[in-house]
């Protein structure tokens, strides 16, 4: 099964300026992500960036890169520009690999692409089990609940589902019903073309979760439990320091 991995790599991060070029073990972070995407078996890996310095770094590493506009509001909009630039067919499978996930397991990139190919949804994603009450009640850990066929019912920063009987007694322990959404997505190219024409939804603006726009407009998102748990992504300097330490010990 063939698929294309696209890595959005926005240069102007508020908390970590120039993040795609942050050095990790002698390579820019975006190059680490690109190498993991290539290891997944993707037919093609394209970095989508808004900055010429990122273009130079990717090309120096032998990668393929597309210079996009700087005014996109989301990574999905950046993907849409790349899809139109290359003229990908509507049924081509595109995997959005976050540019700040230098430790992303290649197996889950392949997994989310395979899952989309096997279902009728326009979009697929992954989740991992939540084992601690601290994570279950953390609004930065996005929870997802699914139906019997493995399609998302809802994503929320709130604690869903709510264990009424258990939590009436204590919130110190949780059951095995909680899943944390992880930010890797597969789409059919035609779905992205439709998506970018939809106005933002009320729910996504309340929760600040872009994927809720898909459910708002009546589309399905396939969800599966990831075969591997991704390590920390890079949002802050402390995250970057942790990733550098992990890489140093590998």
Curated annotation (Swiss-Prot):
One of its GO terms (biological process) is lipopolysaccharide biosynthetic process. It is an enzyme of class 2 (transferase). InterPro entries: Cytidylyl_trans (IPR003329), KdsB (IPR004528), Nucleotide-diphossugar_trans (IPR029044). The keyword Cell membrane does not apply. It comes from the Bacteria. One of its GO terms (molecular function) is 3-deoxy-manno-octulosonate cytidylyltransferase activity. Keywords: Cytoplasm, Lipopolysaccharide biosynthesis, Nucleotidyltransferase, Transferase. Transmembrane segments: none annotated. It is found in: Cytoplasm. It holds the Pfam family CTP_transf_3. Pathway: Nucleotide-sugar biosynthesis; CMP-3-deoxy-D-manno-octulosonate biosynthesis; CMP-3-deoxy-D-manno-octulosonate from 3-deoxy-D-manno-octulosonate and CTP: step 1/1; Bacterial outer membrane biogenesis; lipopolysaccharide biosynthesis. Its main location: cytoplasm. It catalyses: 3-deoxy-alpha-D-manno-oct-2-ulosonate + CTP = CMP-3-deoxy-beta-D-manno-octulosonate + diphosphate. One of its GO terms (cellular component) is cytosol. Its EC number is 2.7.7.38. Belongs to the KdsB family. Activates KDO (a required 8-carbon sugar) for incorporation into bacterial lipopolysaccharide in Gram-negative bacteria. This is 3-deoxy-manno-octulosonate cytidylyltransferase. It comes from Yersinia pestis. The gene is kdsB.
